């Protein structure tokens, strides 16, 4: 009984191992792709958070900066 329960718990890890970690080339590709897409996701999230917290304080928000008054 105990062996069957233990074997069912390892199923997810065995599947992950067989899918990703069995061959070194697949494992390295998975790590590099994960790092690339993880960095992109963190960069996007931090950029959106920065923009949301600094609305009205950014260069793009100042409409008259660098413009000369029009003389009529």
UniProtKB/Swiss-Prot annotation:
One of its GO terms (cellular component) is respiratory chain complex III. Keywords: Electron transport, Membrane, Mitochondrion, Mitochondrion inner membrane, Respiratory chain, Transmembrane, Transmembrane helix, Transport. The keyword Cell membrane does not apply. It holds the Pfam family UCR_UQCRX_QCR9. It comes from the Eukaryota. Its main location: mitochondrion. Residues 1-25 are mitochondrial matrix. It is a single-pass membrane protein. Residues 43-72 are mitochondrial intermembrane. The chain crosses the membrane at residues 26-42. Component of the ubiquinol-cytochrome c oxidoreductase (cytochrome b-c1 complex, complex III, CIII), a multisubunit enzyme composed of 10 subunits. The complex is composed of 3 respiratory subunits cytochrome b (MT-CYB), cytochrome c1 (CYC1-1 or CYC1-2) and Rieske protein (UCR1-1 or UCR1-2), 2 core protein subunits MPPalpha1 (or MPPalpha2) and MPPB, and 5 low-molecular weight protein subunits QCR7-1 (or QCR7-2), UCRQ-1 (or UCRQ-2), QCR9, UCRY and probably QCR6-1 (or QCR6-2). Belongs to the UQCR10/QCR9 family. Component of the ubiquinol-cytochrome c oxidoreductase, a multisubunit transmembrane complex that is part of the mitochondrial electron transport chain which drives oxidative phosphorylation. This is Cytochrome b-c1 complex subunit 9, mitochondrial. It comes from Arabidopsis thaliana (Mouse-ear cress).
């Amino acid at each position: 009984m105990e062996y069957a329960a233990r074997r069912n718990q390892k199923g997810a890890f065995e599947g992950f191992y067989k899918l990703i970690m069995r061959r070194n080339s697949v494992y390295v590709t998975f790590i590099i792709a994960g790092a690339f897409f993880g960095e992109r996701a963190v960069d996007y999230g931090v950029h959106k958070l920065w923009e949301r917290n600094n609305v009205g304080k950014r260069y793009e928000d100042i409409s008259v900066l660098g413009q000369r008054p029009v003389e009529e």
